[in-house]
């Protein structure tokens, strides 16, 4: 289900930002893609690491009146919301120990460990990669998400101004400024 969906979304992005066969075949109107607010012309022809455009997707699921799950939307740009689930589960587990186990609810405690492993694996410096969570800042609506994930993964929470490029590598500023 969802794995195949993410694979299909990545295949779509790969095609749109390279040959554009899906547009040439008129499966999707080219104007619809090229006028979309999130379409980035400058990405056309860019070779992304491992050929994957998005590693983390937020698929919003709903259940219809027949009890069947359906995807309401896919958020590839900035998927958020998992931190609220994780924080809620931590709180509920402390308040009601054992209730999730008795109900057969699967654990989600491994999420941030797996997320960190995924992000680390994407670096050419893996397994010695430095992972950070990049945030627009504390006034962003997803700031709690960014701060929570950084804290849970044990990584730095940084803003754009905390980073600089040195000899083709992205570096994090220190308290001394560089």
Predicted stretch roles:
Residues 1-178:
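Domain-scale recognition of functional cores that engage charged ligands
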